[in-house]
C-alpha cells in the first residue's frame, strides 16, 4: 500500500470535505444511513441482554446486576461508538471515504518506508481480512435471532426455526445477482420504522420500572465491577454484542458523508437502541424469568408474529449491508493489488458502487449455512461473535493514534489520552472475548488469518513476478532505436499492449513480432495504475506520451473505487491527439504460465499458493471491459 499524495488530512480538511448540505439533503441521507450503516448494530437488541444473562458466563439476575449491565451497555455505546467512531475517527477520511483501508493509507503518509510502515500496513490488511469472518457470522446470528421469536409465540415452532432461517438466508444470497437497486431505496424507511418500534417497546417497558433510567449513572457499572470483578470482566464478552456493527459507520462514510451519519446516530439510532435496552432491563426486573428472551417478551402477545416478520426484515437488511460490504472490500483489494481479478457484475446502470462478485457470494453462503447448521442457535453463535469486531476496533484505535499524532499535529499528552482511553476500552472487550475462542471464537480468527494469508501472498507474488519480468525486459528506448536500423513491416490499425512497466518492451509485443513478423501502424504501451484514493477525476484519467516510430506510452489512472473501463478511458486520449477506433484496435494481452524455482523470494508453500491463485485469476479482458473480439492473447512461460 502506497502513501497518499496530495490529500489534506487535517481536521479542517475533513470538515470541508463534509460541508453543510441543504437540510432536506442531510435528512434524506440520514434516513438512508439508518438503513445501510446501522442495520447491524440496530439488530443487536435481539440477542445482547439475552446472552448476558443466559450465555456460558451468565450474569446472576439481581437488580444490582441488571443496573450494572445496562450502565455498561450505555457507556460502551458512548465511548466506543459515539466518541471514538462518530466524533473522532470519522474525521480521518480519504477524500470523503472511510474504512480501515482508507485509514491505513492515511497512516502510511506519515510513516517513512521501513519496518514500522510494514507493520502498520499489515495491521490494516489484517483488519480488512477480519471483516470477512464478521460478514459470515452477522447474517447467521441476526436472522436466527429474529426467527427464534417464533418460539416465544409458541414452542410448537421450535423444530422449524432452523429450516426457516436457512430458507431466508439462502434466498438472500440467491437474489444477490439481481442487485438491490430496486428495493434498496426502502431500506432506510424500513429501518427507521424498526428503530421507532425499538423505542416504543422500550418506553412501554420502562413504565414498569421508571427508576431503571438511573442505569445511565456510571457508578452502577463501577459498583458491578467492584462487587464481582471476574463476573464483570467475563460479562464484557456479551456486552460487546451491543456495539458490534459500530465500526461499520466509518466504513460506510463515503456513501453518505460524516454529518448525516452523525445525525442519524445521535437523533435516531442511539436513543432508540438504549430505550429498548432499558425496557428489556425493566422487564427483567419485573419478572427475572424474562431473561430467556427479553426482546420478544417485551412485545405484546398479539404483536409477536408481526414483530418476528419485522425483525426478520431488519436482519435481512443488516445482512445485505454486510454482504455488499464484502463485495466492495473485495473490489478495493483487487484494485490495490491485494487480490486476483474476480468476475464482477455491475447490478445497476446508475449506481457504480452496486456490484456483485459471484465467487465471494457463494463463499459467504457456504460459510453462513455451515455456521447455522453447526451452531444451531443464536446463543451458540454468540460465542463466535465479537472477537473479530473487537480486534478490528483495536486496530482502528492504533491506526487513528498515528493519524492524530503525526497528521493532525496533536501533542503527546493529547494523543496519549486518546490512545490510553480508547485502547483500554478496546483491550477490555477483546480480552473478555478471548475466553470464547474455543467455544466458536476461533472461526472468525481462522477466516481472518486465511484471508490475510491470501491477500499478502498475492501482493508479494505480484511484486516478485513484476520484478522478474522487468529483469528480463529489453529497455524500450533501445528497442525503438533498433527499429530504425532494422525496420519491421507495418500493418494498418492500432495495437495496444498492456504492461506493468512503461520503460520496457512487453513480452506480448516481442512474441507478436517474432511470430507474426509485423508491427501495427500505431503501437500503444498501456499501463493501469491505481491510487490510494477512492476516485480519480476524469481530467486526470489518462496521460499520453508520443514516442518515435509510431509508439505511444499511455498511463491510465483509477481510484480504488473506480470501475476500470479501458475502452471508456481510451476515448479521453483524443484530448491528447491519440484517437482510437475500437474496430481497428487490437489488444494484446500476455498469458503467463508460472513455473516455480529455487530462491524465488517466497517459501515453497506460499509460492505454490500464489501459482494456484494466478492460474485461477479472472481474465484481464473481462476485468478491463475490453471487447472479446478485439483481444489477442499470447502465452509465455515465466520462472517465478
From Swiss-Prot:
Pfam families: K_trans (PF02705), K_trans_C (PF22776)
Keyword RNA-binding: no
InterPro entries reported for this sequence: K+_transporter, K_trans_C, K_trans_N, Kup
Keywords: Cell inner membrane, Cell membrane, Ion transport, Membrane, Potassium, Potassium transport, Symport, Transmembrane, Transmembrane helix, Transport
Record-annotated membrane-spanning stretches: 26-46, 69-89, 117-137, 155-175, 186-206, 224-244, 265-285, 297-317, 355-375, 384-404, 415-435, 437-457
MF annotations from Gene Ontology: potassium ion transmembrane transporter activity; symporter activity
Subcellular locations according to the entry: Cell inner membrane
One GO term describing the cellular component: plasma membrane
Membrane disposition: Multi-pass membrane protein
Catalytic reaction annotation: K(+)(in) + H(+)(in) = K(+)(out) + H(+)(out)
Record function comment: Transport of potassium into the cell. Likely operates as a K(+):H(+) symporter.
Family, similarity comment: Belongs to the HAK/KUP transporter (TC 2.A.72) family.
Name the UniProt record assigns to this protein: Probable potassium transport system protein Kup
Annotated source species: Aromatoleum aromaticum (strain DSM 19018 / LMG 30748 / EbN1)
Species lineage: Bacteria, Pseudomonadati, Pseudomonadota, Betaproteobacteria, Rhodocyclales
Gene coding for it: kup
